[in-house]
């Protein structure tokens, strides 16, 4: 009760506190930063709403008990984000914030509203009342002990989950993750589907995740599942009450949630309404002298862009005439990122100096223009330095004046230095700039030609102010296309990874102006590079540069030896002369060469990468690897070498007869691509886990996620640097594995291993096994190593070799260890167990060892029996090596049997055959025993004869009773039948002239079925399309009557989801039965028509999960109607369900499909046809048919729907299916089958019939997914629906064809039916008891007292 009052109190307190104002300190803010000590958490005491973010971080050396007494139940809302980082000792948030309900995410931490990062002790999140994160995503990362992450359905908390990033936490396989009730197998928590996994949703083993009823839609709900008021967010304490909300969807005002703020109040911080007086005091809370202002109904910190503060009314904003003159005072504003530029957004006058230092950035020009594009005047100077990301200054599109009130040393007002990519200042035909005071200075702007600078002199009015050295002609434009002479290479050669070049000596007009040369080179896989490639606006420069001094002799050509190049790599190279000569146009007059391409020599490749190995069988290992990162040539082949490893001799130090467990038993099951027919298989003769061997390439989404992760980590580290202390130092990279330094210079092709050594050799720890090797072509990157020993560890080395391997050798090796799979029968003891009597009551058992076991033999287990008692003994490996067996001592006299099994490193071998031995008696006792041995068998013989006599008498008596009461005798007049069997016309009779037959639909049980038109058979319909069933002309009178009697039973059906009988034409020939027309045929044919790869495809899409559930509900509704009326169907399958024009599925007419799908039936023991693939285990075994067995068949129908009518148990014969089902086998989950549908199937396939749900329970579990129209027509929602009884009628029979076909016969004595035979296959059975209401129950051999059977349709196949 106390817990239920918390939200009520919270909502009431929240309204009270907001009325009282900030003094009550219940609305905490603007931000809460908790760090360094647990005691700092006391700042949160009494907080109901945190207006801003909550950060709890960097609390080290804390223990779990430090948090036990800390509890903040009042906190319900955080308006920004929640961040937890490196807080030790905190195990769960459930006690800390039990009522935190909403995180609004108004301000996000790098797109995330909830960040849990590197919380080393956190075991569960535990925010069990968190219902809504309004904006932002979730990032939960690197929490090594965190479980209960996959049990939370974040789609119930967030509107979109695709931006969530949850990685690096405790592996799910190591987490228990049991929701409340799971241990007791009780359904307490709601279920939902995430990534095709339909499971319970919870925050911990004590708290379920709250799921509101579907009727609430997007509205919140209370803890009692009552729908809240539409203005409530998260939760509420009373339904449809806007004063009982825990949080508000829009705004909070005076204890009530409102869609918008009332008049004379103003929106504040996106969640509450305050008065003008409160807004005026807000600056006190922010610790600032600048008051808040009111604009467009909101209390805001400053006027937005396009508005300025109204001087007459200090708390309001007024629009500007043109651009707002927004003056920003900054002594020195340095722009080094988009974030820093954002601080000047909207500024038109910068009162101070502007410095640009933009080294990197993507789409940087657009971002800078957005934030700096309104600046018109800079009162000081402008300095642009090291801004490699800038190509132009056009983003300062409004800059008109640089006043130069403050200047740099040297009296510079415009200073441009070392901007590698700057090529343009402004478009001077459209831009005008005036520099009132000071000079300009340009240096080391390699792509900015002098003409651009001289143009700026003229426009800005600074021409003549600066000296010539202020505009360096040698460093500005030196990498632009200002040269005029082409240098030619005179020689070029290569030696391994070095390139030697010489070129002609350039002779400028004045030789003194030639300073030096610069050689540019870069890797160039393709011959399509240009001089400016790689020098983009992101600041990168992919060209390597080397300065070359002039040679001492004027006659010598300059040259260079480029060293340290990558082997077998093509390089692009060009050389440029550095001069001081100027022409009349004041451009630099220099020289450069054309780009040439050269490839270095090959070298030894690096090692292969990413080696993995998996066992393919007991004698094979599959090895896969990736190419070397540096092939250093054309990769040619790989050398694969392998070596058997000796067994671990330390394993023999233990006596495993006294150990709780044997060593870990694992073989290689790595991830291997299954191409090439080398897919790993299960252990021979055993059932193993299904491995996954597909290494999928990364998708674009995965690559983007990795990029985002790296970017997030960078931002997060920057946050730590700016907010906490210093970033973590770079970690040293750890070698994944060590490899040898030697290279392989030769190889011997050998893909198999030598003859195996005997087992005794394998037990030696000093043996060194030889290496074997084979050569694999470079295209394959995988191989299969064969002829290996079972369950044995191997080392596998791989060397990569390129086209120069004969000269240079191959790479060092990369290696991996892998164990082969166990071999079936390898641990079996060969031969027999030998026995030897050594003394009175002492028997020695000896046996040979397995020849090549799966690893080491650890022990032997002996089982011997005496007089029904089983005894076990254990022999350790050490004892066996000493004695060769075991002595059984103090054995009482008598006959014994014994068997032995070996236990290896892998597991248990098979038991040997039983060996019998006798422990003899002492001589003085043998005579007495001999008398007993003779007497006892004689007595038993007499007893056995008496029992047999009694059994024979009883059996004979019982048969005589049956002969008189149940056997049908051949009639003298076979044409005679009882008058009770005659069909009597009734109100269902339809005049023949009202029936018109149009076209054939197919062959039915008794004859052809037609489509036709009937007049007046349906109320308020003049004509109705119908299905017309007929009887063959050659049918006998009995067959015609049975045909009509079957129709008579259908008269009792009145359910929307059961095919209806509309009328009967019994007068004249042929006899007709008028049925409801199912235009789309049977469900099986309909489902197959939806297969996209079939010729008969109807063009309709494959059914969605909702459509499948709709079909299931309609079939279950029809079956629940039959169940309520004591009918057992016995042949529920897709072929016996029909589909209407509007795609409604109904239980069929119980006989029309038998001939069409004869292959779906199986004749057991030469008797009637049985649908074994749809039958339950109890029906197959004992011939028992109940509603529970119909539920089993319903599960198979669901499987048919999911597979579009594939045959169940495909690949098995009918006999195999019969054994498989009776032994507990189930159908596998179909491909792409939704978890919800498969879960429904599994419930129907419970082996215990009583554990299966009823049809009403099935509908109840899926009713929320069904169409609204289902309520109007279904039996489930009708007044007739009553809960089914569960008591069964005890009926027994073997053959389905023995059920009486004539309903009138059932009204006579039941003994007549006991012997009645029919050729019909399975159908529907009606069981009705006049004296009570019991669960429908039927048996193949017919019924008993007070029952009535539905006549089964005849089948020519029977």
Curated annotation (Swiss-Prot):
Activity control: Autophosphorylation activates the kinase activity.
Cysteine pairings via disulfide bonds: 28-47, 147-175, 179-202, 189-208, 212-221, 216-227, 228-236, 232-245, 248-257, 261-273, 279-299, 303-317, 320-324, 328-347, 449-482
List of catalytic residues: 1131 (proton acceptor)
Post-translational modification: The cytoplasmic domain of the beta subunit is autophosphorylated on Tyr residues in response to low concentrations of insulin-like growth factor (IGF1) and higher concentrations of insulin.
Regions of this protein lying in the Cytoplasmic compartment: 956-1358
Extracellular side: 735-934
Lineage: Eukaryota, Metazoa, Chordata, Craniata, Vertebrata
Catalytic activity: L-tyrosyl-[protein] + ATP = O-phospho-L-tyrosyl-[protein] + ADP + H(+)
Glycosylation sites: 74, 99, 132, 241, 310, 411, 432, 488, 528, 616, 634, 669, 741, 750, 758, 895, 908
Cofactor: Mn(2+)
Transmembrane segments: 935-955
Residues that hold ATP according to the record: 1001-1009, 1029
Keyword field contains Coiled coil: no
Task of the protein: This receptor binds insulin-like growth factor 1 (IGF1) with a high affinity and IGF2 with a lower affinity. It has a tyrosine-protein kinase activity, which is necessary for the activation of the IGF1-stimulated downstream signaling cascade. Plays a role in oocyte maturation. Promotes head development by inhibiting Wnt signaling during embryogenesis.
Entry EC no(s): 2.7.10.1
UniProt-recorded name of the protein: Insulin-like growth factor 1 receptor
Principal location listed in the UniProt entry: membrane
Designated gene of the protein: igf1r
UniProt family annotation: Belongs to the protein kinase superfamily. Tyr protein kinase family. Insulin receptor subfamily.
Domain Fibronectin type-III: 483-603, 604-702, 727-818, 829-924
Phosphotyrosine sites (modified residues): 976, 1157, 1161-1162
